[in-house]
From Swiss-Prot:
Catalytic residues (UniProt): K175, H294
Catalytic activity: 2 (2R)-3-phosphoglycerate + 2 H(+) = D-ribulose 1,5-bisphosphate + CO2 + H2O; D-ribulose 1,5-bisphosphate + O2 = 2-phosphoglycolate + (2R)-3-phosphoglycerate + 2 H(+)
Cofactor requirements of the protein: Mg(2+)
Matches recorded under CDD domains: RuBisCO_large_I (cd08212)
Key words, A-Z: Acetylation, Calvin cycle, Carbon dioxide fixation, Chloroplast, Disulfide bond, Lyase, Magnesium, Metal-binding, Methylation, Monooxygenase, Oxidoreductase, Photorespiration, Photosynthesis, Plastid
Gene Ontology molecular function terms on file: magnesium ion binding; monooxygenase activity; ribulose-bisphosphate carboxylase activity
Compartments it resides in: Plastid, Chloroplast
Miscellaneous comment in the UniProt entry for this protein: The basic functional RuBisCO is composed of a large chain homodimer in a 'head-to-tail' conformation. In form I RuBisCO this homodimer is arranged in a barrel-like tetramer with the small subunits forming a tetrameric 'cap' on each end of the 'barrel'.
Role noted for this protein: RuBisCO catalyzes two reactions: the carboxylation of D-ribulose 1,5-bisphosphate, the primary event in carbon dioxide fixation, as well as the oxidative fragmentation of the pentose substrate in the photorespiration process. Both reactions occur simultaneously and in competition at the same active site.
Propeptide: 1-2
Protein name: Ribulose bisphosphate carboxylase large chain
EC number: 4.1.1.39
Quaternary structure (record): Heterohexadecamer of 8 large chains and 8 small chains; disulfide-linked. The disulfide link is formed within the large subunit homodimers.
């Protein structure tokens, strides 16, 4: 018998199953500055005590398994195990509580969102003792965040590259999202950029389909960008979607975009995966490309209140993995987003230091130290009447993206772009003059429409459009 086995036997190893809380529920534990902290919304099965359910989450997302094993004696569980260190009830819910879990930093590979999520939101979400489980927030310590490159460039470098300051950036998703030929697609891009937008965008569905192969799209969009730049004197861009079936193909598309000299590419980071996204972010930093991120598939993960993962966690993960823009809801448009919660994760994307604020869904103080910020993108069902609210809610460091709100203009794409640019400039000027955008927004738009026929036509078309549904993402 080996000495290690004898040592294990000598301390009284007993095969079988024991309660998780005996090992993984440690209310006396004082968290370390280097711990990754998680807040889980836990809904246990009937008869499962909160302490046992919280400890089970800590165990199954770190070192634990369903039974006692011999090899526990070959390592130091106290050093590596996750710990449920605090439990609190959820207001208004009888059978729900928030379990706070601390994870030692050594459990995670440096610079890998993939590895972090494999542990924290892995098999534990299928655990039978739980009816539902949702990861509400993570605290990423500087000791871990410093192992990530983060966004390829960040907010200030992007503004310097584009030479655009003092206002939100304007964008437009080209519609119809599928079915256009590359040449007609490029024409729409040119018209929108020529009309005054800063960016146009591939829809997340657009990769390389039979009706429009990626290389053709890239070429016609590059032509549109350079023509619009020459005519306006402004730097323009189009989010060329490099998302592909393999990482190698994705990088090949990004290389071609760089060779064309365009400023920005795009990636669907959830469907593409964090490993692919981090690889593309590294390529973009090394080669001077901005990186726009779409969050297609996020609602599958984050929309249910009791199970899954809140978008603020996905937003933090994106800042670590890398992206210069990410879609973040609108508050006022057709897509999900309650104001205070949305502003909470918008701050987590942009700011260096964010204090704990439960009224905005922020469970932990987050210090990003030197990790660059990400521009939030407001997109989905917005039009010129929303411009004052969007400018007031999101501020200058944002991208306001009007797809149908540009291309649906009765006079065409270029007038639609003109209407949005005039509305934005009017709102920024009014704000800078001290006017209240929340209270005077409609009047500001009406005043501007008197000297912009394009804006007047847009105001008439969308004056009755509303999306009046309650947000599901509430505290």
């Amino acid at each position: 018998m080996s000495p290690q086995t004898e040592t294990k036997a000598s301390v009284g190893f007993k095969a079988g199953v024991k309660d998780y809380k005996l090992t993984y529920y440690t209310p006396e534990y004082e968290t370390k500055d280097t711990d990754i902290l998680a807040a889980f919304r836990v809904t246990p099965q009937p008869g499962v005590p909160p302490e046992e359910a919280g400890a089970a989450v800590a165990a199954e997302s770190s070192t634990g398994t369903w039974t006692t094993v011999w090899t526990d004696g070959l390592t130091s569980l106290d050093r590596y195990k996750g710990r449920c260190y605090h439990i609190e009830p959820v207001a208004g819910e009888e059978s729900q509580f928030i379990a706070y879990v601390a994870y030692p930093l050594d459990l995670f590979e440096e610079g890998s969102v993939t590895n972090m999520f494999t542990s924290i939101v892995g098999n534990v979400f299928g655990f039978k003792a739980l009816r539902a489980l949702r990861l509400e927030d993570l605290r990423i310590p500087p000791a871990y965040s410093k192992t990530f490159q983060g966004p390829p460039h960040g907010i200030q470098v992007e503004r310097d590259k584009l030479n655009k300051y003092g206002r939100p950036l304007l964008g437009c998703t080209i519609k119809p999202k599928l079915g256009l030929s590359a040449k007609n697609y490029g024409r729409a891009v040119y018209e929108c950029l020529r009309g005054g937008l800063d960016f146009t965008k591939d829809d997340e569905n657009v990769n390389s389909q039979p009706f429009m192969r990626w290389r053709d799209r890239f070429l016609f969009c590059a032509e549109a960008i350079y023509k619009a730049q020459a005519e306006t004197g402004e730097i323009k861009g189009h989010y060329l979607n490099a998302t592909a079936g393999t990482c190698e193909e994705m990088i090949k598309r990004a290389v071609f975009a760089r060779e064309l000299g365009v400023p920005i590419v795009m990636h669907d980071y959830l469907t593409g995966g964090f490993t692919a996204n981090t690889s593309l972010a590294h390529y973009c930093r090394d080669n001077g490309l901005l990186l726009h991120i779409h969050r297609a598939m996020h609602a599958v993960i984050d929309r249910q209140k009791n199970h899954g993962m809140h978008f603020r966690v996905l937003a933090k993960a994106l800042r670590m993995s890398g992206g210069d823009h990410i879609h973040a809801g609108t508050v006022v448009g057709k897509l999900e987003g309650e104001r205070e919660i949305t502003l909470g994760f918008v701050d987590l994307l942009r700011d260096d230091f964010i204090e704990k604020d439960r009224s905005r869904g922020i469970y932990f103080t987050q210090d990003w130290v030197s990790l660059p910020g990400v521009l939030p993108v407001a997109s989905g069902g917005i039009h010129v009447w929303h411009m004052p609210a969007l400018t007031e809610i999101f501020g200058d460091d944002s991208v306001l993206q009007f797809g149908g709100g540009t291309l649906g203009h009765p006079w065409g794409n270029a007038p639609g772009a003109v209407a949005n640019r005039v509305a934005l400039e009017a709102c920024v000027q009014a704000r800078n003059e001290g006017r209240d955008l929340a209270r005077e927004g409609n009047e500001i738009i009406r005043e501007a429409s008197k000297w912009s026929p394009e804006l007047a036509a847009a105001c008439e078309v969308w004056k009755e459009i509303k999306f009046e549904f309650e947000a599901m993402d509430t505290l």
